[in-house]
């Protein structure tokens, strides 16, 4: 296990999460403006699809947060174990 590679993966996951949050904010703004003037069955179907997409996106963000936390914990565990092992042999 290379702690540097693990730390890099955790950083990339966090960056992806921030990027997704920016995209979601932009999408929500566009959808809100769209539905000011759009009505009818198509608008209702779109609103339902948007709610479904938003629920899936929220699940993805939650899973990403859990994965990031697990990666951070694993990094701390590995680097701690490495430091202990090095200390025993120094």
From Swiss-Prot:
One of its GO terms (cellular component) is extracellular region. It holds the Pfam family WXG100. It is found in: Secreted. It comes from the Bacteria. Keywords: Secreted. Induction: Transcriptionally regulated by the sigma factor SigM. Disulfide bonds: none annotated. SUPFAM superfamilies: EsxAB dimer-like. Belongs to the WXG100 family. ESAT-6 subfamily. This is ESAT-6-like protein EsxE. It comes from Mycobacterium tuberculosis (strain CDC 1551 / Oshkosh). The gene is esxE.
């Amino acid at each position: 296990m290379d702690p540097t590679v693990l730390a890099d993966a955790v950083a990339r996951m966090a960056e992806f999460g921030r990027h997704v949050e920016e995209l979601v904010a932009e999408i929500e703004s566009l959808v809100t403006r769209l539905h000011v003037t759009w009505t009818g069955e198509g608008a209702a179907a779109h609103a339902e699809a948007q709610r479904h997409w938003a629920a899936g996106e929220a699940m993805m963000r939650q899973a990403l947060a859990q994965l990031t936390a697990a990666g951070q914990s694993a990094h701390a565990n590995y680097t701690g174990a490495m430091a202990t092992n090095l200390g025993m042999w120094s």
